[in-house]
Curated annotation (Swiss-Prot):
It comes from Shewanella denitrificans (strain OS217 / ATCC BAA-1090 / DSM 15013). Its EC number is 2.8.1.13. One of its GO terms (biological process) is tRNA wobble position uridine thiolation. It holds the Pfam family tRNA_Me_trans_M. Catalyzes the 2-thiolation of uridine at the wobble position (U34) of tRNA, leading to the formation of s(2)U34. The gene is mnmA. ATP binds at G16, M17, S18, G19, G20, V21, D22, S23, M42, G132. Residues 155-157, 317-318 are annotated as: Interaction with tRNA. The active site is at C107, C205. Keywords: ATP-binding, Cytoplasm, Disulfide bond, Nucleotide-binding, RNA-binding, Transferase, tRNA processing, tRNA-binding. The record marks H133, Q350 as: Interaction with tRNA. This is tRNA-specific 2-thiouridylase MnmA. The keyword Cell cycle does not apply. Residues 102-104 are annotated as: Interaction with target base in tRNA. InterPro entries: MnmA-like (IPR004506), MnmA-like_C (IPR046885), MnmA-like_central (IPR046884), MnmA-like_central_sf (IPR023382), Rossmann-like_a/b/a_fold (IPR014729).
């Protein structure tokens, strides 16, 4: 069993209980550390009576069972209105504009570490909040805090949390960030928690098990158009640019073509003006590669950000291998990033997150690409 030295005895922590194993073990570990722990379950999506996909009821039941087992209070709160206004509307607007958004990042920014923290403060009188994210917090001698990658490199979630402010990190605890995933499941099993073997949630929470294209079509009208090669040859039809992202290989519906080789086809560009999807063969096709990018809507955890001309590493998507790069500031809210070597399938609308070693510095939204 993992033992962690008691700290901050008696301080009150409100744990975001999702009904999953990570938040379950987070609550247990914080109790072991001497905190006064209570759970708070968020309902972020209002499904209708015919919605078979949302597991919120099951998750609530599991969260309550864990809190009962641990002997702690559990509260519930409905953030569906805030979620719709601040996460879902953004999600739709980005897809409508031809970009590929990341709603999980926006959910962390607007709901889990904003609305949740405000509720925990105003209603539950919290000293801290805690989540089951795989990141670490470092407390420095000067009173500052930093956000670090989780110990489990395969589960590290710092990419999704780069928008957190210094103040939010200072008010947040991340117990499972110090552990490997298998250790978390082992602890849950030893404690007899119902969530010990529960499958990890994947995908976008409000879509659940639904087919993504079907879900999106209920909110945004599809606009079919041509699929072209870089040379302008029409080789197929798409059902809507919003259903495709740069670097996509599957689901293009392109069969064997006369005079083409057997290399797979990849999306290399979305021509919004003409409503044309441009595809090319080979994962290293020049049209798929970028030498760099511009990034705007910047957010730095320490508020200052790195110095211009800093040598850092960046992730342009979750679980991507670190990409060495150099950054320069065009203005306080825009940087130019040059990669040490070309990178495939960098996607406007997605987040670029920067690191100095294990420290997550922050990041921003990919705006445009720099081609060779």
């Amino acid at each position: 069993m993992t033992s962690i030295k008691p700290i901050h005895n008696g301080k009150k922590v409100i744990v975001g209980m999702s009904g999953g194993v990570d938040s379950s073990v987070s609550a247990y570990l914080l109790m072991q550390q001497g905190y006064e722990v209570e759970g708070l379950f968020m309902k972020n999506w209002e499904e209708d009576d015919t919605d078979e996909y949302c597991a919120a009821a099951d998750d609530l039941k599991d969260a309550q069972a864990v809190c009962d087992k641990l002997g702690i209070k559990m509260h519930t709160v409905n953030f569906a209105a805030e979620y719709w206004d601040n996460v879902f509307e953004y999600f739709l607007a980005e897809y409508k504009a031809g970009r590929t958004p990341n709603p999980d990042i926006m959910c962390n920014k607007e709901i889990k570490f904003k609305a949740f923290l405000e509720f925990a403060d105003d209603i539950l009188d919290a000293d801290y909040i805690a989540m089951g994210h795989y990141v670490r917090r470092r407390d420095n001698s000067d009173g500052s805090v930093q956000m670090l990658r989780g110990v489990d490199g395969n589960k590290d979630q710092s990419y999704f949390l780069y928008t957190l402010s210094h103040e939010q990190v200072a008010r947040s605890l991340f117990p499972v960030g110090e552990l490997e995933k298998h250790e978390v499941r082992d602890i849950a099993k030893q404690m007899g928690l119902i969530t010990h073997d529960k499958k990890d949630s994947t995908g976008i929470c409000f879509i659940g098990e639904r087919k993504f294209t079907d879900f999106l079509a209920t909110y945004l009208p599809a606009q079919p158009g041509d699929i072209e090669t870089p040379e302008g040859e029409v080789i197929g039809k798409h059902q809507g640019l919003m259903y495709h992202t740069l670097g996509q290989r599957k689901g293009l519906g392109i069969g064997g073509l006369k005079d083409s080789n057997e290399d797979p086809w990849y999306v290399v560009e979305k021509d919004l003006l003409r409503n044309v999807l441009i595809v090319a063969q080979g994962g290293n096709h020049p049209r798929l590669m970028s030498q760099g990018m511009t990034v705007n809507q910047l957010h730095w955890v320490d508020r200052k950000g790195p110095a211009t001309d800093s040598q850092l590493v960046v992730k342009t998507r979750y679980r991507q291998t670190d990409v060495p790069c150099r950054i320069s500031f065009d203005d306080p809210q825009r940087i130019t990033v040059i990669f040490d070597s070309p990178v495939a399938a960098v996607t406007p609308g997605q987040s670029a997150v920067f690191y100095d070693g294990d420290v997550c510095l922050g990041g921003g939204i990919i705006d445009s690409l720099i081609r060779g």
